[in-house]
């Protein structure tokens, strides 16, 4: 893989900048936008970026940091899904707490924002409290977003309970956008000043990157990733007016800045040190880019990937038509098309060939996989196994120089697994999933040296690109994710079945 980003340089620059910012205050509330852990978007668009860079940065500062996690009650009620992991936001909070503790970072508490006694939210609160985790409930702020006098009063932020913290840097994070991070920071700021403490607010958001051009593919890829939020990158006019320098920010931050500035000034009783939304940020990711061409190409590929993802989400009913069309429009505005993703054409061509041969109207599932050396392999679904499993077996055979004629998994192993699945567990689908086939391969590896050699090649699939001609099940997507394979799908179901497609 060609590297476009220097991870070590970035870590050094970023930690230094955060410490400089905290020196101005007794306590700094640092709003962490984007993903704190497993930032797969950043990893894809910035080749060389460590997906866990942010948490490693916090680990470096662990003596000075504690963490508050925000979760919007409405996201619990509607079971909002974190797309890259296929888990709900409330489950992601539990995962996040475990991961933070694994890095020796102190989790102060969980804040439920815009709470109004929702039933599913109450169950989640009970679950946390019975495991010894502090939970605070913040209701919707009265007067927000325009009535600053009410917002900054005992009727506004004052109604929220004060979260007791002990360290100079308080990181406020969440599973995703719209979780109430900013409101939590400002509520805390209000309480700190009422107690006579000098506290500050800053924002750490990786995208958009303020010091690369507005129409750079890296920033356009961010628009594509947040297409459901309708985020649009813009020139920060406040920054230009104050410093005569061009900086990029996004519409929500720019639109909310005048009110945010007034709120901070009313809380502190002083003129804000921030002249622009860009001033509020501490992001130094742009300084880690070492090869702009590599980053541009990776970002273009991400835009195509996002268009596929949004098309599938539209088909599943998760997003509206406007979001679907916007993702497609962003791709077309960059003069990109679906076929610019190398694995798309081989998958579609093979599927068309199989469809013609079988003389069926239903789409055949074919998965194409591009290996690190540029080789593209395909696998198709059969009565025995899914296309995902077939292409993985073909890939490990390729890496291990095993002939295509050799069977890695003995029928003696496969038959009882299929019998268990269909006859005992009552599954409607006889075909084994990718995970089931990998388990079967591992069993064979115990007695078959060839299977063992193939098994050892699985880590080589990390970072590979794949495309499926039909929508994959959540289970198949998660297996590919665990293997480190980025997969896209055509927005087509494998059959007309409604439940058994999954």
From Swiss-Prot:
Family membership: Belongs to the UPF0371 family.
Biological source species: Clostridium botulinum (strain ATCC 19397 / Type A)
Lineage top rank: taxon: Bacteria
Pfam families to which the protein is assigned, alphabetical: DUF1846, DUF1846_C
InterPro entries named in the record: DUF1846 (IPR014999), DUF1846_C (IPR048441), DUF1846_N (IPR048496)
Name by which UniProt lists this protein: UPF0371 protein CLB_0371
Disulfide feature: none
Signal sequence segment: none
């Amino acid at each position: 893989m060609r590297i476009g980003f220097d991870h070590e340089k970035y870590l050094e620059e970023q930690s230094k900048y955060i410490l400089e910012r905290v020196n101005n205050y007794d306590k700094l509330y640092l709003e962490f936008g984007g993903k704190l852990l497993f930032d797969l978007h950043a990893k894809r668009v910035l080749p060389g970026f460590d997906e866990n860079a942010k948490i490693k940065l916090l680990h470096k500062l662990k003596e000075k940091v504690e963490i508050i996690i925000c979760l919007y009650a409405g996201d619990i009620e509607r079971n909002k899904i974190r797309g890259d992991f296929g888990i709900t936001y409330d489950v992601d909070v539990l995962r996040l707490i475990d991961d933070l503790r694994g890095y020796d970072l102190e989790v102060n508490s969980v804040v439920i924002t815009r709470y109004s006694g929702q039933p599913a939210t109450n169950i989640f609160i009970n679950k946390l409290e019975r495991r010894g985790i502090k939970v605070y409930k913040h209701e919707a702020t009265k007067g927000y977003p325009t009535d600053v006098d009410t917002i900054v009063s005992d009727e506004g932020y004052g109604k929220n309970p004060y979260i007791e913290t002990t360290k100079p840097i308080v990181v406020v994070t969440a599973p995703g956008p719209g979780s109430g991070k900013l409101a939590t920071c400002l509520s805390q700021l209000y309480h700190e000043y009422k107690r006579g403490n000098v506290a500050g607010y800053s924002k750490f958001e990786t995208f958009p990157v303020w010091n690369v051009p507005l129409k750079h593919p890296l920033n356009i890829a961010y628009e594509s990733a947040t297409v459901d939020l309708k985020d649009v990158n813009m020139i920060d006019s406040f920054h230009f007016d104050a410093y005569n320098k061009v900086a990029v920010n996004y519409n929500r931050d720019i639109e909310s800045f005048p009110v945010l500035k007034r709120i901070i000034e009313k809380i502190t009783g002083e003129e804000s040190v921030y002249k622009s939304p860009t001033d509020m940020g501490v992001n130094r990711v742009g300084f880690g880019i070492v090869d702009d061409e590599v980053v541009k190409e990776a970002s273009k590929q991400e835009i195509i990937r996002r268009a596929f993802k949004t098309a599938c989400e539209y088909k599943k009913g998760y997003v509206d038509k406007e979001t679907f069309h916007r993702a497609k429009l962003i791709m077309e505005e960059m003069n990109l098309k679906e076929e610019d993703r190398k694995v798309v054409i081989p998958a579609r061509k093979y599927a068309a060939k199989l469809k013609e041969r079988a003389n069926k109207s239903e789409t055949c599932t074919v998965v194409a996989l591009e290996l690190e050396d540029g080789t593209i392999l395909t696998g198709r679904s059969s009565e025995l196994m899914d296309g995902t499993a077939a292409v993985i077996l073909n890939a490990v055979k390729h890496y291990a120089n095993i002939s295509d004629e050799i069977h890695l998994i003995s029928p003696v192993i496969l038959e009882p697994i299929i019998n268990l699945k269909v006859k005992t567990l009552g599954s409607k689908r006889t075909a084994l999933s990718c995970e089931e086939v990998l388990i079967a391969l591992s069993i064979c590896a115990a007695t078959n040296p060839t299977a063992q050699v193939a098994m050892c090649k699985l880590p080589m699939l990390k970072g590979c690109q794949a495309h499926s001609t039909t929508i994959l099940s959540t289970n198949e997507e998660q297996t590919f994710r665990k293997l480190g394979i980025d997969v896209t799908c055509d927005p087509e179901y494998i059959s007309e079945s409604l439940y058994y497609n999954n």
